[in-house]
Amino acid sequence: MKTEFGFSNLVGTIFSKGNLVFTPDGFSILSPVGNRVSVYNLKDNTSYTFPFENHKNISHIALSPTSTLLLSVDEEGRCILCNFLRRSVLHYFNFKSPVGAIEFSPNGKFFAVSLGKLIQVWRTPNSLEEREFAPFVLHREYTGHFDDIVSISWSADSRFFISTSKDLTARLHSVDPIEGFHPCALTGHKNTVVSGFFSKDQQTIYTVSKDGALFVWKYSPLFQAGEVIDEEAEENKTRTHIWLIKERHYFNQNSKLRCAAFHPTSNLLVVGFSSGLFGIYELPSFTMLYQLSITQSNIDTLTVNSTGDWIAIGSSKLGQLLVWEWQSESYVLKQQSHYDALSTLQYSSDGQRIITGADDGKIKVWDMNSGFCIVTFTQHTSAVSGLCFSKRGNVLFSSSLDGSVRAWDLIRYRNFRTFTAPSRVQFSCIAVDPSGEIVCAGSQDSFEIFMWSVQTGQLLETLAGHEGPVSSLSFNSSGSLLASGSWDKTVRIWDIFSRSGIVEPLPIPSDVLSLAFHPDGKEVCVASLDGQLTFWNVQEGKQTSLIDGRKDLSGGRRFDDARTAENSSLNKTFTSICYSADGSCVLSAGTSKYVCLYDIITGVLIKKFQLSKNESLQGVQEMLNSRKMTEAGSIELIDTQGEESDLEDRIDRTLPGARRGDLSARKTRPEIICHGVQFSPSGGAFAAATTEGLMIYSLYNDFLFDPINLDMDITPSTTLTMCAEGEFLISLVMALRLNEYKVVQKVYESIPITDVEHVVQELPVSYLANFMGYLSSFAAETPHIEFHLRWMKSVLTYHGEYLRRKNFEFASQLTSLQKSIVVLSKRLSQLSSNNEFQLSFLLDKMHLRLENTA
C-alpha cells in the first residue's frame, strides 16, 4: 500500500480565536483554527485547511485585496506570509512582540501592524514594481498611543489610517507626510476604543468604545473651534481644519461591546456584545435595522463581506461560526465545534461521512466533500465512548457513559432505538456484527459485556468473565467471533453463536486499551498500557508477533516535565489501532503527538506522522525554555485571568477538583492527544480525532511524482507522442510509469472506446493497482459515464480472477471503484429523474392544449 499520506483537511473545529476575514469576492471566509487557517467557500459549499502551521495559536490574519497574499500571526508575533492561491509558504517573519491588529491597505501596497503602543507600516512584497531582496521592507513607524493598540482601519484611498487603543483614544495617521496634515488624537471616550472607521467620502470618522458609545467626528474648519484652539493655531498656522465630535450615540446594552465592523458603501455598522447579541445600525442616522441574540457567550469577532449582505460572526468559547444574511434574515452558514474534546470517530461505509463523538455528549456527522457538519445528535447526557456503523452504513450505533446505547437512522436523522442494561452501568466501548442484527457494549462498572437484538431491542445475553473494565470490543469479518479487551490484562474471544460457553483468555503483559481484527478475521492486534502491539492467531490462540512502540511515541514535553523528550515515553501508550484495507499495515495512535504506521510482517515503523506543531499545546515542544520557569512553576500554567480589566472576565467560576470542561482551571493548556484513528474504507485516507479537531490525511495524487521503473526516454512528451501514433497500450504503460496525474488522464481519455478491451486485456498486472486508483479518480471527476463504465467492465472481466485471488491486496482499489460507481449512479439517476419530470410536464401541456383546441 502507498504510505505517502499528507495533511488534507481539518474538520470538527470551525473557529478557535482571532479574527474572521472575507475574501474580496465575498463568497469565502477565512477562519483561524488553532495554529492553522481554514477557508470555507459559501458558494460551492466546500472547505479546506492550509497545510502550514504557526508556532502557536493564531491571533490575527489578513488577506490582501487581490487574494494573493495571506498573513497569519500567532500569539507571540511570529508571522507567516503565504501565497493564498497556491497554498504555499513564502516567508517566515518574527515581529518580536504580540500583535494587536494587522490590516492590508485597500490598494494592497502596504500593511499596518500594531505592536503594543507602536504601529509599523510595511511594504507588501511585489515582484512587479520594486524588486526587493528582503520580503518585508519597513516603510514607517508611528507612535503616540500610551497603551496597547487594539484595531487599525484604512481609508479608501490608502493615504490615512485610524488606530484605536486602550488609552481611550483614537489617532489619525497618514502613510506619507502630507503638507498641512498633522496627526491628531480623537479623545472623549470613557473606555477602550474598540474600533474606528472612515465614511465613504472620508469626511466623517466613527469611533466605537467598549462601554457602548458611538462618536461621530466631522472634519470642520479651524475657526469653528473658537478660542479653544487659538493657541495651537498660533503655534502651527498650517493647520486649517480639525476633527470635532458632532454627535454622540449610545447602544444602551447591559453588556460590554466586544467588536464592530463597518461597511462604508451601505453605511452599515455591525456591533457585537458580550451577551451574545449583535445589532445592525444605519449611519449617520443611527437607525437600528436589526438586533438578534445568537449565543449565550461573547461575540469575539465580526466582519462584513464586500457587498454588505453577509455578516460573519465568531464566538471562540463555543467554537461557533455563523454567516448571517441580514436582508433575508437567514443563515448562510451555521457551524459549531464540539464543546469538549473528541473521544471517538467512525467512517461511514462509503467514506463520504465521518461521525465524531465527544465528551460533551454530542454526536456530529461531517460531510467529507464539504467539511461541514450535517447534523448533530444531542440525546446522550454524558460523554460518548464509542461509535460503530452497520454493514449497510445507514444505521449508526453509539455508546455513552450515561448508560445507554442508541441506534441512529442516518437517512431520517433520528434515534429509533435505545438499549439499556438491567442495572445502571457506564458503557465504555461498542461493537456491531457485520449483519447489523446484534450490538454489544462493554461496561466499565460491572466488567460485563451486554448483547442486544437490534430488531427487538431486547437484551439477549450478558457475557461475564472479565475482572476489570472492558476497554475494547471488535467483531471479526464473519461476525461469529467477538474479541474483548479489558484492564485485567486479558483478551477473550467469544464465539457468540456456539453452544459451548468455554472461553480461554489470551494473556497480555499489561492492561488492554484497544484491539482490532484483521480484515480476514484470523488475527487480532492488541494495544496495551506498556506501549506494545501484540498480534495473536485467533484459531490457535498463539502470539505471532510483537511491536514495541513506546520509543516511537516518545517526544514532546509538558510544561512541567522534569524529564527530557527522549525519556518521556513512560506514560506514552497506544489507545487506538486500525488495520489497513489490505491488512498489511496497522495504524496506531494514543497519548502522543505522533501517529505510527507499522508493517505487520516485518514489524518495522514505516512512517510517523506528527499531528501538530502547535506549541500552545502541551506535549509538542522538544525543548523547554528555562526563562519561563519560576518559583510558582511554568509561566505558561500561571493563571492571569484575575488581572483582566472587565469584571465578567475576572470572575472565578471554577469548581474545585474539576480537571476538564468549563469548570476546570481557568487557564488550561490542553495536551496533544489522539483519541481515535481510522482508515477510510478505500484506504486512500485516514482520520485522527485529536485535541485540535478531526484531522484528515490523504494521498496527494495530483502532486505526487512517484515514478515506476523510470527510463531516460520516458518523458511526458514522448508518452503523448506514442499515444498520438496509436500505440495506446505502450503510451498508457509509459504514463503509469511516470505516475503523473495529468499525463495519465490525457492518455486515458485519448484511447478510443473500441480499443479499451484490447488495452485492458494486455495491461500488465504490475500496473493494475495504480491504474485502478486513477480510474476511480477519473470516474468521480469527469462526466464520461459510459466511457468509465466500459473501462471498469473490462478491468473486472479480464483481471477478475486475479483480483479475486488478491482480494486483500486490491481491497482499497475495489472499494474506490465501487464508490465511483455509486457517484455515477446518483449523478445519472438525478439527471434521468429531471428529464422524466420535464417530459411528463411537456406531455401534459400538449394534451391540455389538444383538449382546449378540440
UniProtKB/Swiss-Prot annotation:
This is Periodic tryptophan protein 2 homolog. One of its GO terms (molecular function) is snoRNA binding. GO terms for cellular component: cytosol; nucleolus; Pwp2p-containing subcomplex of 90S preribosome; small-subunit processome; sno(s)RNA-containing ribonucleoprotein complex. The modification Phosphoserine is found at S645. InterPro entries: G-protein_beta_WD-40_rep, PWP2, Quino_amine_DH_bsu, SSU_processome_Utp12, WD40/YVTN_repeat-like_dom_sf, WD40_repeat_CS, WD40_repeat_dom_sf, WD40_rpt. Keywords: Phosphoprotein, Repeat, WD repeat. Belongs to the WD repeat PWP2 family. PANTHER family: PERIODIC TRYPTOPHAN PROTEIN 2 HOMOLOG, WD40 REPEAT PROTEIN. It comes from the Eukaryota. One of its GO terms (biological process) is ribosomal small subunit assembly.
